[in-house]
Amino acid sequence: MCGIAGIVSNNSSLVQQQKLQLMANALQHRGPDGEGFFINEQQQVGFAHRRLSVIDLSNNAAQPMHYLGRYTITYNGEIYNYLELKLTLQQKGYKFKSASDTEVILAAYDCYQYQCLQYFDGMFAFAIWDNQTQQLFAARDRFGEKPFYYFIDNEQFVFASEMKALWANGIDKSINNTQLINYLSQGFVSNPTSGVTTFYNNISKLPAASYLYYLPTTKQLNVERYWDIDKESKTAITKIHEIQEKFGELLQQSVSRRLRSDVSVGTSLSGGLDSSSIVAIISKLKNPNSSLKTFSATFPGFEKDESKYIREVAARFGIENETTSPTAI
């Protein structure tokens, strides 16, 4: 995971490098491999980025990344189908200087604008400053795997991967009592896929499967949803063996895309059906000369401890397994 943060000023006050640094410091644990900053010529917009290198470890993939002299992005996540999308964009005439998925997002946005989100298979939260239209575009993945918090008032729009980065910028921490009461009485705050409120009065979250445009000249913020589950859709496949084949095909494709990495890959192994199936597929797909590391939590003495199944799966596929036994429960 990476850490992203940014400030867009909508008055005469200038974005300060010092504030961006404080925000980046608050996100250091999210990106140990480096940091980067961007402040535009007018000092109206500033981005901060903490990097965790996964795809294209070179400086060509460093962020914030610039594209076509027009766009600048700070991005957290991974686009699993970036190679397929990159090929499509190359056929349209786009050229790339890096091997990263970050640059693919920028090219896709230039090509499709907000509709680029329909092409992304992945988990992501990012913000793009368009120097030509002088507006900010930000988006979050379909299920909200990657976080995006923001603060807005008459002077600025501030965003970050975590609230603590907003607080580092001086944003107020006053509690949203309504949300707190809802949580204590009902056990939940709001719909996690559609709610924008948080436990803090001045901090909002971009909902899952949503994007926003912010235009500082008019102080206008527009948030739109770009995707939802089609509850009425029905598959044409009705035979059990065909359903099994299609499910296996989709699961293998999904796992395969998540193995795209320029660093070592590991996976959780709980001993259950889901994680064991993923380990089996990875063992089938991986290079025979490479090792697969798995990580497990075991609970000796508990009735539902699955250590036995973890050992069986590890032995069956000849994989490395590291276990830990939490005691503070």
Sequence positions of predicted segments:
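Cysteine-centered catalytic environments shared across enzyme families
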Residues: 1-329
